[in-house]
């Protein structure tokens, strides 16, 4: 089963406000902690901060949504995000479960988010049984198709992953980046302007 599928088309204004969140690590029970932090309270504080900056058009949640693959955590996550009034699109991280295609929250896991003037490609770097990331052949193929679409249409492309594709200057995070990131980065070379 593929974790990501489909296209979500958002008809927003000429400019789009997209917020990216990662590593919410919600636990099975409300009030669960990770490294001494109540992750539900942390998410609530982040949502208040996002709301204070005005309306947004979309949320990208880029992995480690749950801290222990607990299904209840995903339901609470969806409920917490409702207050922001924007659709949210999710990527799995190394701490997340992947569901069957008929799971009620599966609609959050889209391959592509299409905004009026640019596209967002969601790539799954989850490598079951490992902490470090890895891009399966299907993810590399999706990237190739998205790059070809960007070249054909001239639409800018943003690529979202959980595991970094390049070193970010944080030793422990750099150690768990996508193992085959170079394969992805090579596919991005044809795009003349890019930021990674």
How would you name each of these model-derived features?
Residues 1-76:
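N-terminal active-site segment of His-dependent metallophosphoesterases
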Residues 2-7, 44-46, 101-111, 143:
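Alpha-helical scaffolding within the catalytic cores
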Residues 15-28, 117-127, 158-162:
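Active-site-proximal beta-strand elements of phosphoester/diester hydrolases
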Residues 23, 59, 64, 77, ...:
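Divalent metal-coordination and catalytic microenvironments
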Residues 30, 61-82, 97-109, 133, ...:
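Metal-dependent catalytic neighborhoods of phosphoester/phosphodiester hydrolases
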Residues 32, 154-196:
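Active-site-proximal segments of metal-dependent phosphoesterases and phosphodiesterases across multiple
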Residues 71-87, 175-188:
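Short, electropositive alpha-helical surface patch
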Residues 88-99:
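A short, structured active-site edge motif that brings together acidic residues
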């Amino acid at each position: 089963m593929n974790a990501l599928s489909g296209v979500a088309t958002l008809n927003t204004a000429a400019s789009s406000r997209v917020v990216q969140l990662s590593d919410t690590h919600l636990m099975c029970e409300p009030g669960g902690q990770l490294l001494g932090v109540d992750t539900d309270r942390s998410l609530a504080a982040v949502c208040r901060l996002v709301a204070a900056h005005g309306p947004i058009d979309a949320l990208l949640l880029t992995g480690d949504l749950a801290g222990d693959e607990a299904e209840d955590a995903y339901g609470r996550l969806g409920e917490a995000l409702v207050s922001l009034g924007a659709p949210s699109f999710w990527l799995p991280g190394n701490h997340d479960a992947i569901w069957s295609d008929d799971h009620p929250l599966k609609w959050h896991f889209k391959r592509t988010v299409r905004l009026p003037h640019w596209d967002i490609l969601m790539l799954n770097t989850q490598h079951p049984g490992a902490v470090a990331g890895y891009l399966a052949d299907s993810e590399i193929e999706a990237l190739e198709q998205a790059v070809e679409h960007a070249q054909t249409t001239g639409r800018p492309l943003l690529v979202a992953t959980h595991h970094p594709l390049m070193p970010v200057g944080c030793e422990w995070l750099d150690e768990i980046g996508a193992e085959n990131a170079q394969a992805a980065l090579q596919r991005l070379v044809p795009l003349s302007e890019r930021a990674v």
